Structure formats: C-alpha cells, structure tokens
C-alpha cells in the first residue's frame, strides 16, 4: 500500500525539516522561529506555516510556550523516530569531584538509538580527567540511569555525596574510579566509603 499523499511534504517543508535536523545535530537543541526566519530569509508567519504543516503531518512535535519546543519525530526517508528529549540536570566534575545538584536546567535532543529503552539524563563535564576517553571539558554527556555497572564502564558515581565521571574498575574486592588521563591517579573506594552508581555514560555532545 502506498503512502498517504496527505503525509507527503513539499520541497519547502523538506528544507525546513532538514534545517531543523542539521541545527540539532550541530548544537543539540532545535532552532527558534526567529533563527529559521533569518536562515531562510522569510517571515515568521511563513516559518510558522511550514512548522504547522510538519506538525500536522507527524514529522514534528511542538511543545507550546517554548521558543525551542520542536522535536523531530520522524524523517520522510526512514519514517523512524529520530530524536528524543533528555533532561539536563546540572554539572558533574570530571576532575576533582564536586556535588552535583539534580536540578533540571534544560533539555537536549538525542538520537533515539543512543537512549534506547532506558531513562537518561545529561550533564556538563568540567576538567580534563577523561580526555583519553574522548570526554573533554564542557562536553555534555548522556547518561542512562542504572544503579549497577560492569567493570570497564564509564559511569557517573556518587562517592560520599560528591559526583564524578570515571571508568569503573572492579577487581575482586577492589573497586576504583579510574580517570582517562595519565597525569591523574585512580580514586580507590574504601570499605567505609559510600559509593552509589547514578548511571552509565552512553554518549556525549560537544555543544
């Protein structure tokens, strides 16, 4: 059975959808109507019209009252879910551990294949302790919430109420939080320490 022609999008609507996808891929969040108006050299009303048609046809989802409230829900070539919104919940130290307050400060759009079926959150990193794992100062890391992790996983760990991102090393009774920077030493978890795994790092975005 062929696709319903009501779901077909025009070249101008395709151009708009492609620009939203490009913008999200580059910056991690969708453009505003004003930004798209400037990009295409058209009026705000024309941008709204394109967005309304894409929402009606199921290619976009719009959250009312937000300037950056667009989410791409499918692509005409794949007809597959493309992006999901993940909450940003603060800053985690990637050097010296600091307390991370789980206050939601915003959202970032992430490929659905990265998130999978789990619940995720995002955090900005500070410091250079994980540079050899490709995690640099200021990166936004995507974390899948899970209370346990395996040896070798990069995790967000809460150690005595201080959060840090490190590689988890488990060797019999020995547990260490290992930096990916040869200049820094591992943090050995002592029996009296309170260690809690907040989640596993599954991706990152360089904003």
Curated annotation (Swiss-Prot):
Residues marked Cleavage (site): 94-95
SUPFAM superfamilies for this protein: LexA/Signal peptidase, Winged helix' DNA-binding domain
Coiled-coil ranges from the UniProt annotation: none
Pfam family, one: LexA_DNA_bind
Protein family per UniProt: Belongs to the peptidase S24 family.
Subunit structure: Homodimer.
Name the UniProt record assigns to this protein: LexA repressor
Native organism: Oleidesulfovibrio alaskensis (strain ATCC BAA-1058 / DSM 17464 / G20) (Desulfovibrio alaskensis)
Species classification: Bacteria, Pseudomonadati, Thermodesulfobacteriota, Desulfovibrionia, Desulfovibrionales
